[in-house]
Design a protein with these regions (language model features):
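A generic local secondary-structure boundary/capping motif
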Residues: 30-32, 125, 135, 150-157
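Residue-level signal for inorganic ion chemistry
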Residues: 13, 41-43, 66, 100, ...
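Short beta-strand scaffold segments in enzyme catalytic cores
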Residues: 15, 39-43, 134-138, 144-145, ...
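Contiguous, small/hydrophobic- and glycine-enriched helical/loop subdomains that border
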Residues: 108-145
Length: 279
């Protein structure tokens, strides 16, 4: 069977670290939205018990989250079926948009369906968490308030907007950010309702803009159109619009400056889950 879908990206409308856990990970509080834009992924199921990644990423296949996700499913279920996976990457790597995590979640969701594994959502969320902290939101597939390391998700209805998402010419290494003395890692915990009553922020932004001034330049540029934010640990930044025409006008200005960007709309349901529901 041949199946193609869009592996979407996410934005963090706010992001705070509330403390370090005994296992070395950090607890966070963040509000995710899913966008209708992402990498095109194609799956062709086979009967030869092999997982083949047809797209060359320039590093060993065994290190790829797409491959790891497929092999994790096989190991968990003892599935003897195979698949050929190809991907058309459009999302920037290291942008804080969750592209790689979304790809891994897409593999779990799609192969669970195509291989007739019938794993429930709770199991898929657990598998996703083992692959990465951003994977569960893409298994969830809706806007959600996240706590823990990002795996404790509460679905939230968020008004949908068009977002202009721009990425400067730099990649931000997340691990280095966590080691920074300037990163606030003890923000007092709040409920979602308390967060929504205050101005939003991203705890990584002050650290990133100091190390990467081009991110600050981009945030300042986007401020002409509304409140601008950085997503995740950066470096992609975004601003919300109520209509696509205003977003397109702003994007033209970015194009003149040769700044990479795209326009996408937040959605109530991930395109992956929407496509799978049609099968």
């Amino acid at each position: 069977m041949l199946f193609t879908t869009t592996s979407p990206c996410k934005l963090n409308l706010f992001l705070y670290i509330t403390g370090k856990r005994p296992d070395g990970y950090h607890n966070l509080e963040t509000l995710f939205v899913i966008l209708d834009y992402g990498d095109k992924m194609t799956f062709e199921t086979t009967d030869d018990d092999k997982v083949e990644l047809l797209t060359d990423f320039g590093f060993p296949v065994a290190d790829n989250l797409i491959y790891k996700a497929a092999m994790l499913l096989k190991k968990t279920t003892n599935c003897q079926k195979g698949v050929k996976i190809s991907i058309d990457k459009v999302l920037p790597q290291g942008g804080g948009l969750g592209g790689g995590s979304g790809n891994a979640a897409t593999v779990l969701l799609v192969l669970n369906k195509l291989w007739n594994l019938n794993l429930d959502k709770a199991t898929l969320l657990k598998l996703g968490t083992s692959l990465g902290a951003d994977v569960p939101i893409f298994i969830q597939g809706t806007s959600a308030y996240a706590t823990g390391i990002g795996e404790i998700l509460t679905e939230v209805k968020v008004p949908n907007h068009y977002y202009l998402v721009a990425t400067p010419d730099c990649k931000v290494p997340t691990k280095l950010l966590f080691s920074s003395d300037k990163l606030v890692k003890n923000t007092p915990s709040k409920t979602l309702e308390e967060h929504l009553k205050t101005s939003h922020d991203n705890c990584f932004t002050p650290v990133v803009v100091q190390e990467y001034p081009q991110v600050q330049t981009l945030l300042d540029l986007l401020k002409k159109y509304g409140k601008s934010y950085m997503s995740g640990s950066g470096s992609s930044c975004f601003v919300a619009f109520d209509d696509i025409d205003h977003a397109k006008c702003a994007q033209k200005e970015l194009n003149k400056l040769k700044i990479s960007s795209f326009i996408a709309k937040s959605v109530d349901l991930s395109p992956v889950i929407a496509d799978l529901n049609k099968l």
